[in-house]
């Protein structure tokens, strides 16, 4: 059989996926063992997404803002000759931030993910880290203001992962979450599918209300886009939770993670909860109501190591 373009055969690769998360840096390490006979490795490193803020709890016909969606993690990718790395690497997968309910303040931030040559995240040990700053959670709505959008995770720097100089590396910033719907009453802010090459998305905003029901935020449609066709469904108005995010992948889709949709707002009943984010993506904000909806949790991180 001819070797087309001198590329390795499809059956010769080794792919390991790490998803068990750690809530505290430098604890709960996982290990990767170098497979026999490989010459190259590539890794995708994604941290935890930010949680969604809660919708405001208020009496019927009173003003209340929706919760803000959490930001998404930045993404780091490295490609290194296998001969340049030890036979064992240590992996930490960062947890997603927890969503909060009404009055809970800013939702939890995500935790960074790491690949290290020893079970310690000191820069001298680090082959790859998902970013410089983790994704931040969204803010909680009040009677006077909407919940703020959660800040996106920022790109890593080579100074924080100097061993990546053994190969090639790429850094991609995360996506900001979306603010909650207006206190006068409005649908939650919709999120957009990014065109920056990031694989994660921020969470959408929860709806606000004064005297009517409003839908939580979803994802804006894109014409003739396969990813757009697969996006989470936008919730209906009323006591309706936002759709949860999820991870797409082969054979039909590329690797891509959606954040959670925002919870809907209800004037005379409870607001809907925000949807949880997919891996590395933000949780949706909660909707306002007589009991404000809780924001969704940010998705836990993801580390994939391919060797061939």
Please provide the spans of the model-predicted regions.
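Long, low-complexity, polar/charged, intrinsically disordered or flexibly structured peripheral segments
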Residues: 201-278
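Enriched but not universal
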Residues: 1-40, 77, 174, 224-228, ...
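Glycine-rich strand-loop-strand elements at beta-sheet edges
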Residues: 21-35, 45-119, 123, 137-154, ...
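Local beta-strand/beta-hairpin segments that build beta-sheet-rich folds
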Residues: 17-18, 122-128
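Chymotrypsin/trypsin-fold serine protease catalytic domain
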Residues: 159-160, 164-178, 189-197, 205, ...
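Glycine-rich, low-complexity segments
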Residues: 1-24, 140-142, 181, 186-194, ...
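Compositionally biased low-complexity segments at domain edges in trafficked proteins
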Residues: 131-180
């Amino acid at each position: 059989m001819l070797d087309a373009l001198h590329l390795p055969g499809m059956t010769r690769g080794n792919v390991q996926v790490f998803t068990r998360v750690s809530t505290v840096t430098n604890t709960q390490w996982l290990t990767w063992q170098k497979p026999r006979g490989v010459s190259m490795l590539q890794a995708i490193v994604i941290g935890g997404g930010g949680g969604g803020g809660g919708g405001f709890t208020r009496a019927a016909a009173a003003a209340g803002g929706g919760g803000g969606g959490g930001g998404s993690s930045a993404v780091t990718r490295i490609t290194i000759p296998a001969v340049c790395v030890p036979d064992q690497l240590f992996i930490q997968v960062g947890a997603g931030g927890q969503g909060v309910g009404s009055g809970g303040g800013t939702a939890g931030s995500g935790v960074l993910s790491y690949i290290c040559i020893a079970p310690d995240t000191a820069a001298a040990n680090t082959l790859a880290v998902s970013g410089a700053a983790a994704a931040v959670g969204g803010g909680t709505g009040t009677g006077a203001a909407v919940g703020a959008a959660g800040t996106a995770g920022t790109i890593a720097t080579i100074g924080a992962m100097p061993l990546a100089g053994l190969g090639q590396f790429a850094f991609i910033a995360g996506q900001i979450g979306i603010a909650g719907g207006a206190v006068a009453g409005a649908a939650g802010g919709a999120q957009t599918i990014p065109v920056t090459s990031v694989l994660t998305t921020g969470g959408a905003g929860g709806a606000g209300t004064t005297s009517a029901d409003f839908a939580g935020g979803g994802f804006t449609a894109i014409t003739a886009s396969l990813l757009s066709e697969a996006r989470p469904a936008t919730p209906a108005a009323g006591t309706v939770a936002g759709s949860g995010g999820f991870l797409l992948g082969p054979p039909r889709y590329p690797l891509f993670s959606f954040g959670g949709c925002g919870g809907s707002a209800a004037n005379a009943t409870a607001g809907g909860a925000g949807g949880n984010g997919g891996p590395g993506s933000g949780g949706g904000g909660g909707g306002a109501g007589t009991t404000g909806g809780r924001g969704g949790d940010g998705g836990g991180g993801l580390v994939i190591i391919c060797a061939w």
